[in-house]
Every structure is written in C-alpha cells, then in structure tokens.
Amino acid sequence: MKIDPIRNRLYTLTVLSCYLVLTPNMLSKLAFNALHGMKEYISELIQFKKLNSLNSENNEWGEITNDSKYEINILFIGEMMRSDYLNVYGYNEKNTPFLSSVNGTFVHNFYSADTHTVPSLRIMLTYQGENSKIEPNYPKSFINAANNAGYDTYWISNQGLIGEYDTPISFIAKSATHKYFIKLHDNNAEDHDMLKVINYYISKPSKKKKLIVVHLFDSHGYGSLCDQNKKFMTENKLLKYSETNKKDVECYSSAVTKTDKIISETYKTLNSKNIKFSIVYFSDHGSSESTDNAGNIFYKHEDNDKAGYKIPLIRITSDDT
C-alpha cells in the first residue's frame, strides 16, 4: 500500500503532531498499535480485492423454501452494545422501557464473533458450515439466502462510509434489492433519522415477504452524540451526568434508551398494520469498561475482556402476547 504524504496532508500532519507532543514511551506504544492496525488493514485490503472480483450476487445457496409466516421481518444490527447495560438484561437503570415491558425472547450468554465491527459481522452474517476454520463465506451471506428464498430485501445503514461498497459489510449489503445509506446523504444523521426510511420500506407495496436490515450507529457514538442523547436521560441520569467520572456511563446508557425507542416506534408501526411480523435485535460486539488516570469511566474495544463479546439477542413477534 502506497501513501503519498503530499496528497494525504491529514495523515502527514497527524504523524508530525504525534512526534512533537508525545513522549518516547507513548510513541513506542503508538508505533506498535499503528503497525498492528496497518497489518490488519492491509489484510482487509487483500481480502476486499478478492471480494471485488466477485459479483455481489454470486450466490451459492441454491433453492431455499420460504415457509415463514411473517410478512415483514426487521433485523436491527446494533453497534458496541453490551447486554449487561440493558435494563431488560438486569442493568440497574431503567433504560429499556419498551423492551422491559414487551413479551419476547431475550437470549442470555450470547457472544459476538469479535470485538470489532467488520471482523465480527463478516462471520455472523455469513454461513460458516462445518469448516473448522472460522472465516467469512460471502457468497453464502444471509442476504443472499433471503433473496433465494424469495424475500424482498432492504438494507438501511447509519454507518459512516466513504462509499457505499468499501467494506466487507457494505459488500454484503450490496446484495440487498433496496439500499439506503443515511450518512451518504447526511453526515450528521442520528439513528432516529432512519425511522422515516424504515416506515417507507414497511409501507412500500410488494408481493413478496420482506426482510429489512437496519444497521444502527447505536452506542458506538455515545460520546460524540451525548448532548443529543440528553433527551433520553431521566433526572437521575442528568444528575449523574454532571459528575465527571459518570458522564460516559450516562451517555452510554442513554444510547441504549434511544435504541429502545427506535425499536418501540418500529413495533408500533408494524402493529398498526395488522400483519404478521418479526423484529430481531443483536449487537455486532460489546465493549470493555475502563478508567483513565483521572478516574473517569469510558468504553473501548478490548479483545481480552469477555464484556467485549457479550451482546444482546432479542426477538419480538406479532405472536408474542
């Protein structure tokens, strides 16, 4: 991979700034992390080059019988949401008012394939079969399976992208019949902005059953979106939010409440249609709670922490009463 320092001014300025302000010890850690990240990135580029040599509709599933009774199926894919921070899974803050009140299936002790989005979802969204080596099988993605089963497939995403098809996950999304990437249209989009697109696809006339995938930004942006998320905080949460070391905790918890609200609004829309439906939610990975030198709690990716893998898996259907 070739980086042109003249064209990549931001990259050059970042490197120079690091050398000016960081200590030797910090630089050594930064260099190690940078090399590790570069190695992973190059590996992804090699794999993605192989992906681009394939047609996204290259489908190895064969004929699949569609005997599901549900006319509309919604799959919410969350981001960085660990299950023990949801009230419905036992968290002490009442941050899931809808999920805690509705009947459904709530799976405990469910774990993601990785602690980062792409490595996790490329495994979780493709068929592994009997292979002892766990690796993505893109021609056998779940979207291709739904297409073969005769579903009308939709993919709505609030994940920030350079282009629609520049990651393995967006490559899977490309196989959907209908695609809408919110952040290609609005860089400041919130997950709530997807509700109008979800409602449009729910109401869109179709002779087929529907699979609608909604890829949320979820709690991944808990810090940058915290001011927006204040409207989801109770008075008790706002009080804790004023405590410096509790700020990120309440931001993270309010992101959970926002997702709960989105699922609730979608449920209400589907329920008003008097149709058979299914809603599934899971997160791509969890997060690890950590503390900085000042005692402030924050969340990060951590391969060696079980919490980085522990995620919610929820299913709610029109049959649940």
Say what each PLM segment does.
Residues 25-239, 308-310:
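Active-site-proximal alpha/beta segments of enzymes that process anionic O-linked groups
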Residues 1-34:
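Transmembrane and membrane-interface helices of multi-pass
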Residues 155-157, 211-218, 253-256, 278-283, ...:
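Short beta-strand segments
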Residues 90-94, 271, 275-319:
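Histidine-centered active-site microenvironments of extracellular/periplasmic hydrolases
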Residues 56-60, 196-200, 236-279:
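A long, amphipathic alpha-helix that forms part
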Residues 133-138, 246-259, 301-309, 321:
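A short beta-strand-to-alpha-helix junction
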Residues 86, 267, 291:
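Active-site-flanking alpha-helical
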Residues 147, 318-321:
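Non-catalytic, well-ordered alpha-helical segments in soluble enzyme domains
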